[in-house]
């Protein structure tokens, strides 16, 4: 089992004008990540899981809808997934 750790900003980002479909997909994404880890996320084509580059190198991204993304980092030696941001497709750092 993988541990999911959310950044403190994520609650604030999700409490705004986020569609309920995106919230449901985010919860399902967390369930899959908790059980199967990054390999399980990559196996599901609907998430379009991919590695990021540039200043986000070392992070990964999964789609929660056409516009919404979850950006996360994997710490493999402790089976930890750190969720950095849930955003409306804006990869710039806050």
Report the location of each language-model feature.
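Basic, Lys/Arg-enriched alpha-helical interface segments
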Residues: 1-68, 74-94
